[in-house]
Amino acid sequence: MFSILKRTDHLEESFLKNPNDNLKELENIIIEQEEALRFSSLSYADCYSLGVIVRDLYAKAAYTAPIVIDITLNGHQVFHLAYDGSSPDNDAFIKRKYATVQRFRMSSMRMGLMMAQQGTTMPAKYDVPAEEYGAFGGGFPIKLTSGIQIGVFCISGLRQIQDHCLIARSIAEFLTTKQ
């Protein structure tokens, strides 16, 4: 898990420095995350524990922007936390990220990097409404080790790469301590 965390740090640093550089390398790191950050099983109680982990990591990182955290398992919202200062706009972004992850079975950040590399957008390539789908960081597939997707983990409120990496770090910590 240490290696995936180190790669996550590299991903965040690189993207924050220049979001248009090394898009393929960044996409490959996200693919590694999506393959490594899988669960042997996941219960509703586990989702609560995962939500608490992200809450604690958010506090420890001392971010100043308010966020909304959302974990959906098998189509059922099992964890939702909105910080003071967040707004319904954050929930709208979560819905768009959720739709992207649910339909395309990959993180919304990965979708955004793919679209940037191809010089297109989701509406142009997949004929989906822009107001319903979002190709930006903060939506991550919850998958079992078998590869079956059972849910979606979303964060909205930070810069897109920070939303994405906060999710990855939270799952990595959960897997290290709980499974």
UniProtKB/Swiss-Prot annotation:
It comes from the Eukaryota. One of its GO terms (biological process) is post-translational protein targeting to endoplasmic reticulum membrane. One of its GO terms (cellular component) is TRC complex. Belongs to the UPF0303 family. This is UPF0303 protein P4H10.12.
